[in-house]
């Protein structure tokens, strides 16, 4: 008997999530993980590191509640958005009995988190224009306890129609939790569904400081939901999820002056996105640039593998989507600095 055979059967069969960092590469320009291109500068207080952190750092809870326009009772701080995903699955799904439902092409961690927990997965692909297929979702809700949707959707970049999310909430009422992943909402804040929280107790929203706040290394995310749902999740979350240094920096990031800085830098990035989209459209290798409301662009190439490989060899690391459902020959490009965007365009232009 080996150590592997002692592990759970579903773990033995598990294909782990291939994060951008795990895929690696020897890059000088990293545009594969939807990270912000520059790092903010904060100072750690360095105090109380000998003490365990608060179960929920109250200054961070209050600061995020103020930022999001909700009560502190609506906020749970997590180790990145991914812990929020895992937490909801562990809390609401019975292993080998219940299922989650997700709509590919979308973020891969929904399925991986369910598989790790021994929970079944159902997938209802998005429509050709990357919107929810509500009739098919309705037909597949048996045994589903959690439905995950992502808006703006990763990797396609588009927003889901709010009217469709509203319909989804109505058909799942009393049956399942609906999780709307808003990791990229700072790039289109007017599209948030946060105003629906008060009327739909089965709605949970995933947020993060990893994208527009440029703090991916901090691992700080949030679940926003009604107080009853937050209380249930609080029973399951680890006792000390947020390290003191992470809480310290998160609280600084959520101060009004820094939020104003984030909003200004976001506008600069959106300008870079617009420039990049226009520049890519005229390249002979690029067949389509999909509309995006996030900090990345999805492009379809004549030969996506050739483009990806050519840039990889030059140290420009993008995210290959060729094996993703309905995204053959597609590449996802994180919007970087203007200089990085220019180098991407020049490199693709040279691909034969």
UniProtKB/Swiss-Prot annotation:
<keyword id="KW-0028">Amino-acid biosynthesis</keyword>
<comment type="subunit">
    <text>Homodimer.</text>
</comment>
<protein>
    <recommendedName>
        <fullName>Histidinol-phosphate aminotransferase 1</fullName>
        <ecNumber>2.6.1.9</ecNumber>
    </recommendedName>
</protein>
<comment type="similarity">
    <text>Belongs to the class-II pyridoxal-phosphate-dependent aminotransferase family. Histidinol-phosphate aminotransferase subfamily.</text>
</comment>
<dbReference type="InterPro" id="IPR005861">
    <property type="entry name" value="HisP_aminotrans"/>
</dbReference>
<dbReference type="GO" id="GO:0030170">
    <property type="term" value="F:pyridoxal phosphate binding"/>
</dbReference>
<dbReference type="Pfam" id="PF00155">
    <property type="entry name" value="Aminotran_1_2"/>
</dbReference>
<dbReference type="InterPro" id="IPR004839">
    <property type="entry name" value="Aminotransferase_I/II_large"/>
</dbReference>
<keyword id="KW-0032">Aminotransferase</keyword>
<dbReference type="InterPro" id="IPR015421">
    <property type="entry name" value="PyrdxlP-dep_Trfase_major"/>
</dbReference>
<dbReference type="InterPro" id="IPR001917">
    <property type="entry name" value="Aminotrans_II_pyridoxalP_BS"/>
</dbReference>
<dbReference type="GO" id="GO:0004400">
    <property type="term" value="F:histidinol-phosphate transaminase activity"/>
</dbReference>
<comment type="pathway">
    <text>Amino-acid biosynthesis; L-histidine biosynthesis; L-histidine from 5-phospho-alpha-D-ribose 1-diphosphate: step 7/9.</text>
</comment>
<keyword id="KW-0368">Histidine biosynthesis</keyword>
<dbReference type="InterPro" id="IPR015424">
    <property type="entry name" value="PyrdxlP-dep_Trfase"/>
</dbReference>
<keyword id="KW-0808">Transferase</keyword>
<dbReference type="GO" id="GO:0000105">
    <property type="term" value="P:L-histidine biosynthetic process"/>
</dbReference>
<dbReference type="InterPro" id="IPR015422">
    <property type="entry name" value="PyrdxlP-dep_Trfase_small"/>
</dbReference>
<feature type="modified residue" description="N6-(pyridoxal phosphate)lysine">
    <location>
        <position position="211"/>
    </location>
</feature>
<keyword id="KW-0663">Pyridoxal phosphate</keyword>
């Amino acid at each position: 008997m080996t150590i592997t055979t002692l592990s759970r059967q579903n773990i033995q069969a598990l294909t782990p999530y291939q994060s951008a960092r795990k895929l690696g590469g020897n890059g000088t320009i990293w545009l594969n993980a939807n990270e912000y291109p520059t790092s903010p500068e904060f100072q750690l207080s360095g105090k109380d590191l000998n003490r365990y952190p608060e179960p929920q750092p109250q200054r961070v809870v209050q600061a995020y509640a103020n930022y999001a326009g909700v009560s502190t009772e609506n906020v749970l701080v997590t180790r990145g958005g991914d812990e929020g995903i895992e937490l909801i699955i562990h809390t609401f799904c019975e292993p080998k009995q219940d299922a989650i439902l997700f709509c590919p092409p979308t973020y891969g961690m929904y399925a991986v988190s369910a598989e790790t927990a021994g929970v079944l997965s159902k997938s209802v692909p998005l429509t050709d224009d990357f919107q929810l297929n509500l009739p098919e979702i309705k037909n597949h809700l048996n045994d589903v306890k959690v439905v995950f949707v992502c808006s703006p959707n990763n990797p396609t970049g588009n927003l889901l129609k709010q009217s469709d999310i509203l319909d989804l909430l109505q058909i799942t009422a009393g049956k399942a939790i609906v999780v709307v992943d808003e990791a990229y909402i700072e790039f289109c804040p007017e599209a948030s569904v946060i105003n629906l929280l008060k009327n739909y107790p089965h709605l949970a929203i995933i947020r993060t400081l990893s994208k527009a706040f440029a703090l991916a290394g901090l691992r700080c995310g949030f679940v926003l939901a009604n107080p009853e749902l937050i209380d249930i999740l609080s029973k399951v979350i680890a006792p000390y999820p947020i390290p003191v240094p992470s809480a310290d920096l998160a609280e600084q990031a959520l101060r009004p002056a820094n939020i104003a800085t984030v909003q200004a830098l976001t506008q600069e990035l959106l300008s870079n996105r617009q420039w990049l989209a226009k520049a890519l459209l005229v390249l002979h290798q690029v067949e389509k640039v999909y509309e995006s409301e996030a900090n990345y662009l999805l492009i379809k190439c004549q030969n996506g593998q050739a483009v990806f490989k050519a840039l990889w060899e030059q140290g420009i690391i993008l995210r290959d989507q060729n094996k993703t459902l309905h995204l053959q020959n597609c590449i996802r490009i994180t919007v970087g600095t203007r200089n990085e965007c220019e180098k991407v365009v020049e490199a693709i232009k040279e691909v034969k």
